[in-house]
Amino acid sequence: MGAPFSCPDCEDHPPAFDCVATRYQANGLVRDLIHRFKYSGEFHLRQILANWLEEALSDPRISREPFDAFVPVPLHTTRIRERGYDQIAALVELMAKRSHRPVWACLRRSRYTESQTRFSRKERLQNLRNAFELRKGSSVLGKRLLLVDDVLTTGSTLDECARILKAHGAKSVRAITVARR
């Protein structure tokens, strides 16, 4: 179980999301299972990873007030073709089914970006600039949203997605991830 932590970068440059909760460090077995699910097509691992994501729902920062819908961080269509599936959408779909909460796939990856894994914080922010947009016909005005991603490293992806959601009127954007680096 991870405890709340304070990030010096976030203190200097507050992110657009209201809070983020995660229960695991992305190393050892956790890192291995995430990588096998994402890159080796081991789709059956979604059960375990969805369970780990669900643990983050009990964090007081997440559970203190209800949310209207899960919002998966979207993959670009090129990545979906490469992997055969959208790993975050698969996890969120399973969580939504179990919890009877809706999924709003209201974000789309409008621009293909290089993998974030080798980039510094500054490079990650630049790489993601204008990479997401609200899907046409989507409305998040006044909604309390729970953004979902697999790994939190610098928070750049969550920040960019939350920025878009709040720019379109979301009341709050909290986030959960399977693990953090």
PLM region spans:
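PRPP/pyrophosphate-binding module of the type I phosphoribosyltransferase fold
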Residues: 66, 93, 102-181
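Extended interfacial segments that mediate partner engagement and assembly in macromolecular machines
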Residues: 1-97, 117-118
